[in-house]
Amino acid sequence: MSRLYLNFVQKSFKYLILLIHVNYLDASKDIHIYEYLDEIEIVSKLEDRKKGLMYRETIPDNYGMFFVWPYEKKQCMWMKDTYVPLSVAYIDEKGKITEIYDMVPLSKNSVCSIKASKYALEVNSGWFDKNEIMTGDVIKIKEILSHDK
């Protein structure tokens, strides 16, 4: 085989590996959340968002609380008076999950988004991992908001 041909094959192989790697990194998926959760409580009023899941000692396995803010900005949550370990996903206005955090019961430390968010979804701790939902995935927001009507 000629040296030129071998060089071509090597570069082609490297390019193929790069394409596979880039596609793997962008392997986000669309999430139809009602395929995963049986019940979603939507909170959009200020007083409801402030209360969140406070004072509840348990929540069902396939339950979530969906927070809606009037506009997209950096958001914060805390676990004051919340007895259940939770995970929170911060979600941008297009439905993309930008961040996921685990939160400690009764903690007064704020868990803030780094990026601007319009929505958040709180669920039992570990729920996102268990359901293989991760940052970059896109939640179909319209399905949630129309389901509430």
Task: List the predicted regions and their residue ranges.
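Hydrophobic h-region of N-terminal signal peptides that target proteins for export
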Residues: 17-25
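Sec-dependent signal peptide recognition
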Residues: 7-18
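N-terminal secretory targeting signals
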Residues: 8, 24-30
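Compact, glycine-rich, soluble single-domain proteins
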Residues: 28-149
